[in-house]
Amino acid sequence: MQLEVRNLSVAIHRRPIVSGVSLTVDNGEFVGMLGPNGCGKSTTLRAIYRLNRKYSGLIMWDGKDEHTITQKEFARRVAVASQFNDIAFDFTVREVVLMGRAPHMGMLTRETDSDQEIVAQSLDMVDMAHFSDRSFASLSGGEKQRVILARALAQKPEFLILDEPTNHLDIKHQLQTLAIARDLGISCLAALHDLAMASRFVDRVYLMKAGSVVASGPVGEVVTSERIHEVYDVEARVTPAGPAGDDWDGGLTVAYRYPQRVR
């Protein structure tokens, strides 16, 4: 599933948050959005996945204006795993993941054996099968994050949107989450913080600062010492993670140094 965003702008309480953002995600491509806190990554994603419909610009899915796509079709084809995981009622983990099947079920129909199998597979993918009968509210932040990802996987989407998907996760599950997104073979757009981690998995990145895209392209061309200093206001040294051809090939190592000693 293809996504094209043209000249997207969003203002909140008349204050511009996102200004003129344009981006594309092709079929099967894993694209990352990078940038410091408050740069507009999440605001851009919320417009794309319809949480905020008050925007100017154009959002197109497979060449169709998003306003021509029904909510039911959108929910069947696009899944979202966001960083805000509060659920008002006390559901079990299995019940939360089963919500991902809702777009594929009728109003008055119950889940099928196939739905239950998809839920079990999704929980297994994120190492949460052994928690399936636990209360969602009782989980840690990282465990909740993995359940929300499982819910998105259970939708069997054509396009996956991830908003800070590795927040609260230990290193193993950060790697697992991004590997899942890469290996699904579907289109994925993810807002990420860890530059080195992103470099191991995504095909291209958009680097944002103050609500605008300042650079885009392959990670190795965008994530440079100069750009990190420009966007994040820290000194950085960027090097390949390993010699070409070995198991580390394709990633970057990013070392940081704050320019002044904090007193």
Regions found by a protein language model. Give the residues of each.
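Conserved ABC ATPase "signature" region
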Residues: L98, D113-F131
